[in-house]
């Protein structure tokens, strides 16, 4: 599933193409995604200029004068920029939406159809008040994210610290890979109760989250199965993981075998020596 780094890589790849350009038309081939694409979506965007592209959590927010169209990649979604100087590749089975510009096509592909393409009109208020966005946690690269915030929001909580990171109500975008990697960098065992982690350890964890996500963005995200960036290239962060998907292999720091457990129906990886 694309997480914050993969979505940010996509945003950075797309924005230079679309910002300041007008959508000539929208071709919706499959309206039944995770939620239905609005019936008048294509008409609403015809000839609209894209003012910019932002990211909130794992959502991409494309601003036009009349509002925002929101794209979520779901589990298997990608957005590709395809040149339009010659006929672009014919849409394949899982190519659901095309935004056609004068020189290129922005194509949304999603084999499992858990992604979404939605509309938020400007007269409904700021897009961040949209029901899907309003309750999200803080952005990990914002000034609001800190060890103090993690410490405050987890007092009295018995859920594991890894599950607290994944929940998304404190901080967004720390998916399964990045939670395991961040906890390793911070030296915190993922099974530790969130409410029992001290402030100094949470300060280390906040720094580790930022560093892990920044490294992942720099490497183009992680490609475990389907993800490619807007240029069609795979990400490479998974090749440098300290613990994720390395069960039984030696820790890159101490040499102890990496362990794998299941938490909340998801695999967790950690070093029993480096993480306490």
Swiss-Prot record:
Signal sequence residues: none
Pfam families reported for this sequence: Fapy_DNA_glyco, H2TH, zf-FPG_IleRS
GO terms classed as biological process: base-excision repair
Keyword Chloroplast: no
Active site residues per record: 2-3, 58, 266
Catalytic activity of the protein: Hydrolysis of DNA containing ring-opened 7-methylguanine residues, releasing 2,6-diamino-4-hydroxy-5-(N-methyl)formamidopyrimidine; 2'-deoxyribonucleotide-(2'-deoxyribose 5'-phosphate)-2'-deoxyribonucleotide-DNA = a 3'-end 2'-deoxyribonucleotide-(2,3-dehydro-2,3-deoxyribose 5'-phosphate)-DNA + a 5'-end 5'-phospho-2'-deoxyribonucleoside-DNA + H(+)
PROSITE patterns linked: FPG_CAT, ZF_FPG_1, ZF_FPG_2
Organism expressing this protein natively: Burkholderia thailandensis (strain ATCC 700388 / DSM 13276 / CCUG 48851 / CIP 106301 / E264)
Zn finger residue spans: FPG-type: 242-276
Homology family: Belongs to the FPG family.
Gene from which this protein is expressed: mutM
Keyword Lipid metabolism: no
Cofactor note: Binds 1 zinc ion per subunit.
Purpose of the protein: Involved in base excision repair of DNA damaged by oxidation or by mutagenic agents. Acts as a DNA glycosylase that recognizes and removes damaged bases. Has a preference for oxidized purines, such as 7,8-dihydro-8-oxoguanine (8-oxoG). Has AP (apurinic/apyrimidinic) lyase activity and introduces nicks in the DNA strand. Cleaves the DNA backbone by beta-delta elimination to generate a single-strand break at the site of the removed base with both 3'- and 5'-phosphates.
Cofactor(s) the record lists: Zn(2+)
Taxonomic lineage from the root: Bacteria, Pseudomonadati, Pseudomonadota, Betaproteobacteria, Burkholderiales
EC number: 3.2.2.23, 4.2.99.18
Protein name as it appears in the record: Formamidopyrimidine-DNA glycosylase
Cross-referenced InterPro entries: DNA_glyclase/AP_lyase_DNA-bd, DNA_glyclase_Znf_dom_DNA_BS, Formamido-pyr_DNA_Glyclase, FPG_cat, MutM-like_N-ter, Ribosomal_uS13-like_H2TH, Znf_DNA_glyclase/AP_lyase, Znf_FPG/IleRS
Record-level Gene Ontology MF annotations: 8-oxo-7,8-dihydroguanine DNA N-glycosylase activity; class I DNA-(apurinic or apyrimidinic site) endonuclease activity; damaged DNA binding; zinc ion binding
Subunit structure: Monomer.
NCBIfam families: fpg, PRK01103.1
Keywords noted in UniProt: DNA damage, DNA repair, DNA-binding, Glycosidase, Hydrolase, Lyase, Metal-binding, Multifunctional enzyme, Zinc, Zinc-finger
Residues that hold DNA according to the record: 94, 112, 157
SUPFAM superfamilies linked: Glucocorticoid receptor-like (DNA-binding domain), N-terminal domain of MutM-like DNA repair proteins, S13-like H2TH domain
């Amino acid at each position: 599933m694309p997480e914050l780094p993969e979505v940010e890589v996509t945003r950075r790849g797309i924005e230079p193409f679309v910002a300041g350009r007008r959508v000539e038309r929208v071709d919706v081939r499959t309206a039944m995604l995770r939620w239905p694409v609005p019936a008048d979506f294509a008409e609403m965007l015809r000839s609209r200029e894209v003012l910019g592209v932002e990211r909130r959590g794992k959502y991409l927010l494309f601003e036009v004068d009349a509002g925002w169209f929101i794209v979520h990649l779901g589990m298997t979604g990608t957005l590709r920029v395809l040149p339009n100087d010659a006929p672009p590749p014919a849409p394949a089975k899982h190519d659901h939406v095309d935004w056609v510009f004068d020189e290129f096509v922005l194509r949304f592909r999603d084999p499992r159809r858990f992604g979404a393409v939605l509309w938020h009109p400007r007269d409904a208020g700021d897009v961040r008040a949209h029901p899907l966005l309003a309750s999200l946690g803080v952005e990990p690269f914002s000034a609001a994210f800190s060890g103090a915030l993690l410490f405050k929001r987890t007092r009295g909580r018995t859920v594991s610290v890894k599950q607290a990171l994944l929940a998304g109500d404190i901080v967004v975008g720390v998916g399964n890979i990045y939670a395991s990697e961040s906890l390793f960098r911070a030296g915190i065992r993922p099974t530790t109760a969130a409410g029992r982690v001290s402030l100094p350890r949470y300060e280390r964890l906040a720094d580790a989250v930022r560093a892990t996500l920044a490294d992942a963005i720099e490497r183009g995200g992680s490609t475990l199965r389907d993800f490619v960036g807007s240029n069609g290239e795979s990400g490479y962060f998974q090749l440098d993981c300290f613990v994720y998907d390395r069960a039984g292999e030696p820790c890159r720091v101490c040499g102890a075998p990496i362990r794998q457990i299941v938490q909340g129906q998801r695999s967790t990886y950690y070093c029993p020596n480096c993480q306490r």
